[in-house]
Amino acid sequence: MRKLLRSVFSIFIAAGLLTPISASAAPNLIEVQGRVRDLQEQATTAAEGAQEAKVTLAKLNKTLVTVQQEASQQGASVTAMNKTIGAIAADQYKSGPLSKSLELLFSSDPSLYLSTAGSLEAVTRKKTADLKKFSVATQRLNATSLTVADKLSLVKAAEAKFRRQLQIANSKLDEAEALLAKLTAAERERLAKLNDDEENADQQRSLADAGKYGSVSGRGGTAIKYALAQIGDRYIFGADGLTTWDCSGLTMRAFGAAGVSLPHSSRAQYNYGKAISRKDLLPGDLVFFGKPISHVAIYLGGNRMLHAPRKGSRVKIAEFDLGRKPYIGARRL
């Protein structure tokens, strides 16, 4: 997915449509910039949905492998027990016709045997125990087989969601590409310069401010130090280092340096740690934005945060605000 989106996202980097345009910019450029930004945000939201589905799919596949192994082991156990049951039946046959209880045993519902096992006068206690074990093992295998089928269904659903969200993301980027294609080369060059000037100014401020936040202790402090070292690195969707990042890739690696394992998904990361109210925020807390969640950053204090913002931008320190994407909540790890 990273390869599929990267080539299209590069258009925004070249065109520089990711920062506000000065008042002197032509009205048509302002209109195009606003529309492209809107499409970009829609694509990011859909892409985060795809990333969430990817994380879910990995977990489901891991569970599926475990359950399939259990089913295989249980199947082998039932097969081995069948040999013992066959020997019991053969022994009973030599002693005379099959009793009603054995007929029940070999019916399509082995559990019927349990209610009549005590009446098998010709079968020893050991044989009775073997027959009970066989019935229990068969029922367990049936239950596990149903679990396998259920997990397979969930895997297919996650795969479908991944494909659907990716299609939405790409369709939004296609729309944005079509808008950019209508601009002249001179207009694209002008927008690129505006973006570069703004981005360079952001980077200078971020590097100048970085020293203010290096003294935070604990896991959050370790994560901050790691992320501060990435200031200036480019944003690429799906990237998790070591020189390019997306928002959740950066926070995943930053807290990984602090010994905290997080999934590569902003929505999935929201389920980790302890919920924190906005008034109780501390440096090192994760803060989340968007409905549905499509962005995560590291809170620095003083209404500032550290994040990998968006396509065409770089890791930076920024105001604690994402405009159209509302603040959703925070987690402390």
Residue ranges: model-predicted function:
Residues 207-333:
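Peptidoglycan cell-wall recognition and remodeling modules
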Residues 1-31, 154-229:
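Hydrophobic packing segments in regular secondary structure
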Residues 100-103, 176-204, 283-289, 308-322:
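Short secondary-structure transition/capping segments
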Residues 37-40, 51-160:
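Amphipathic alpha-helical segments with strong coiled-coil propensity
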Residues 136-140, 152-155, 166, 186-187, ...:
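Short, intrinsically disordered/low-complexity patches at protein termini
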Residues 1-69:
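N-terminal or membrane-proximal amphipathic helix/coiled-coil initiation segments that transition from
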